[in-house]
Regions:
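Pocket-flanking alpha-helical
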Residues: 7-43, 126, 130-133, 150-155
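A conserved helix-loop-strand patch within extracytoplasmic ligand-binding domains
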Residues: 44-95
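A bilobed periplasmic-binding-protein/Venus flytrap-type ligand-binding module shared by bacterial periplasmic
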Residues: 57-67, 189-202, 223-226
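C-terminal functional modules
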Residues: 207-266
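Extracytoplasmic/secreted envelope proteins and their assembly/folding machinery
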Residues: 9, 13, 32, 75, ...
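Solvent-exposed loop/turn segments at secondary-structure junctions
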Residues: 9-10, 29-33, 65-67, 94-98, ...
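Ligand-binding pocket segment of bilobal, Venus flytrap-like solute-binding proteins
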Residues: 21-25, 97-173
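C-terminal lobe and pocket-closing loops
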Residues: 149-214
């Protein structure tokens, strides 16, 4: 098995042009325009939602802040107590789609009038660093992030309830010229595992295995945090997962394979 690091768009482009790779383990379908055409053309088949609860985006506060001030877990509570979140919404850098959406949410919610600044970071690195700095000092923090991610594994966060998502309003919220922005949650992103149709036909057993593989965001966050803390490689992290999550992966495979793998881990 050859593992090729990639991302949704280039991996799908490669499948379209060359028929490879055989398996794409993590396709973020909302950011991959080639996905539906390849499905409709019969070149790929969707096996499962590899992130069972989907990729999540939104506005978050640190766990310690939510525990001290549970009212901050709703946007109404945040806007009623702007000083408790540091009078600031930490936003994505200019050029990122999330910056436009978050700024429109801020406009719709009247953040500025309530005393919450829409602070646009200069880079993704400074956005991430602001979370680490807040955690180190146990200071207020409120802003945009996503999961699964290493940051969410290292710094546990609580998502602020912005109200239900209305798909019909999302296009305007994603437009920097939106005249009627809406206060609402981000949609959950469907993240799937796909295989080429040729691979599914020639490797049914392997396809069945991949169809069973699914993780929660919390599981992925914890694995990323462990890998970072230990300075581990991807292979070492896989061994750690197999050694500590036998109940989970044991549900993915048959009895014979489960016994064989368990013996190797002894």
């Amino acid at each position: 098995v050859t593992v090729v690091p990639s991302a949704s768009t280039p991996a799908l482009a490669s499948v379209s042009e060359t028929g490879e790779p055989d398996i794409i383990t993590e396709v973020w379908t909302n950011g991959a325009p080639a996905y539906v055409p390849l499905l409709e053309a019969g070149k790929i088949n969707e096996l499962t939602n590899v992130l069972s609860d989907g990729g999540l985006e939104g506005l978050f506060i640190p766990v310690y802040l939510a525990e001290a001030h549970p009212e901050l877990t709703t946007i109404e509570g945040v806007l009623a107590n702007p000083d408790l979140v540091g009078n600031r919404m930490h936003n994505c850098p200019v050029g990122w789609t999330c910056q436009v959406v978050a700024s429109n949410v801020a406009k719709a919610g009247g953040f500025e009038a309530a005393g919450v600044e829409d602070f646009v970071h200069g880079s993704g690195e400074t956005l991430t660093a602001s979370i680490g700095a807040a955690y180190a000092a146990k200071e207020p923090w409120f802003g945009y992030y996503w999961t699964p991610s290493l940051v969410m594994g290292k710094y546990p966060m609580v998502q602020v309830d912005l109200g239900p998502h209305d798909a019909s309003k999302q296009a305007c919220n994603s437009d920097k010229e939106c005249a009627t922005p809406t206060m609402q949650s981000w949609p959950s992103s469907v993240v799937t595992t796909v295989v080429t149709s040729e691979f599914e036909s020639s490797h049914p057993a392997e396809t069945d295995l991949m169809r069973n593989l699914s993780f929660t965001n919390n599981m992925m966050n914890s694995l990323l945090a462990w890998q970072d803390a230990e300075g581990a490689t991807g292979d070492e992290t896989a061994v750690y997962f197999l050694s500590t999550q036998q109940k989970l992966w044991g549900s993915w495979i048959n009895d014979a394979a489960r016994a064989k793998l368990a013996a190797l881990l002894q």
